[in-house]
């Protein structure tokens, strides 16, 4: 649906003129650099009409540009009105939004941005780039101009109660996590560490919340020194159970007090992550803060034994729900019934809700038929979504939050007869998926270094996909978790893959206007016993967590090697052996058919 943004832009430009801004930048993120935001923080979506999870809007006196990546080109082109220019990131000749700001400004002109919505390193780099290339000035505004335009209709910020993540799922207590953090701080020679990422706060204190849809986190900051810890959170969210849980470890203070405490602090060596906002950095003093790789991010990414146990168990239960759903949908459609994409997604959620550890979805289900599958992050509308066409490819990317883990799985199905091109491209993507599943690599390897394995077979035919190959997955936390992941962007070269990390493995192929195919398993990284250990290195590999059948109608066996056939048959055998005892009679029969040897 297209939102007409002319009036909103006119009001914003009036405010820009009052403050002397040539350009005003509206990022996607909230004050905690979150990828997914609550409704009150969806400022870029409000001003532009584009509601994908990634993108940046830059507004000028007569211009409005929306920058996003390949996952959202189709969606953005459908949602932006005539006031906007879509800037397709990664295409030759298309600047980044930062480069665009330098191109569109002159000496002494001002570029405005809410200082809480840009990270300190990004603000510092942009400030220097503007000064050197155009002579313009970056202004960190303490007001948000979009909020002013939004006015009274802006949604209220959530006030959901916090819950305690039980030690049997968390694996480590708050005292142990604080001890480990302080040891890391000593190694870095810092007096304090500012925790600003919401999933890091939640993980550190074994708490979960519901402030951001699909992500069990809550708005908070934390300041940890070598002998004290402070949690800045709206105290209306804190239950007696939470207070008891934190007693003796951390002092609870009002959320907004973090800024005054920062300004009055005597600390001089303060560690911050690269995701900490410019506003926080300036509150402490830019000369006092040191951007470092967050020790919490590293610890959180490597799942402990309890977290891995939970991830394995929740993926089994989730696999059962997915099989029950596809068995039901297959029978329903082939009996001549009709159902739209949204109602099908709702039915899948109903199967997941039958599990008593179910806490919600981990993202909005991508239930897409035919050409909608080519929209990589498609969301079926509640009203007017397409009827699932059994003669076309159906792509379903879904996941759930359970008390013991988080899931994310994509299966692409055909309930009729696919074309040769559909089978060919699906098989090429599946071959890339298998190549990653079977890889053995030395410790120290990054996700950036192995991304090519997933794309190689598509590349041979001059094909590719415009998204990353894998992202980290939290443990009853965010379904997208950095720095873990596999992809061609620099961020995936920043930290090596390590045993205990969980990532997705999800190559795909998309033909605009026709269909999309994606195959996604969650995997965990584990040590591999190799015959040799060159230079004494440890070798690692991937182990599937996701258990769900692949659509054999979309597999062309003539394109598979004997090793790939062996992998698929062994995987399907594991799927059937593990899931079948917990399935209904009809789902068990369906699964037997769809896990038969190739």
Swiss-Prot record:
Transmembrane domains' residue ranges: none
What EC number(s) would the UniProt record show?
3.4.-.-
Which protein are we looking at? Uncharacterized peptidase C22G7.01c
Cofactor(s) in the UniProt record: Mn(2+)
Instruction: Give the record's GO biological process terms.
Output: negative regulation of transcription by RNA polymerase II
As one GO molecular function, the record gives: metalloaminopeptidase activity
Keyword Metal-binding assigned: yes
